């Protein structure tokens, strides 16, 4: 998502990758851009055609304004300070992505109540989005209770330690892998649903996609049974 945004604008894109090292995230971006098997990338065993697409992907990535932050222990105020600086540089700030919300440190104000801590973080991100006039995409964990249900399709109440997340967010979307039989192997894209659970200014709906695991690519499904990369 951050990569797609970066390719379409000259504005700065801030990615706070609090779970995955930036190096690993960049490798996934190269895999997606060049449509190169991520297993080949991780081992360095690329074929001639792979190297060509690798260089093209590097060139595209180098032309974007993506800024990574992968250090742990970051607080909402630190995120805001970094984003404020990016907003004053170049063409300004176009998008903020945080992976994931529950890994952000809160103040000691609500020490002992994780739900209140997450609520404080959620409100701080909402305030930042309004002040800087920038969209903020914050990934969130789901509660383990979803695995105990027969119907595992996510609902709003499944947001882990949700607090005020569902109230603060303009849009809440969840990814869901339908329980269908699919051929085994990385070559076959897996069906996946993007479920819009909340849309403050629009309808909720479910969008059918395909996920190509070996290149970490989502594909939109065309009515004529084709597929195009997103």
Where are these regions (language model features)?
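N-terminal cationic and glycine-rich segments that engage phosphates or anionic surfaces
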Residues: 1
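Cytosolic-facing regulatory segments adjacent to core modules
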Residues: 4-92, 106, 206-208
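Short acidic/His/Gly/Ser-rich catalytic and metal-binding motifs that mark active-site loops
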Residues: 24-25, 103-107, 145-148
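C-terminal regions of RecA-like/P-loop NTPase motor modules
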Residues: 80-96, 110-112, 123-132, 144-230
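Walker B catalytic acidic pair
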Residues: 100
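…and closely analogous acidic/polar surface helices at protein-protein or active-site interfaces
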Residues: 117-122
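Catalytic cores of soluble, metal-dependent hydrolases
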Residues: 140
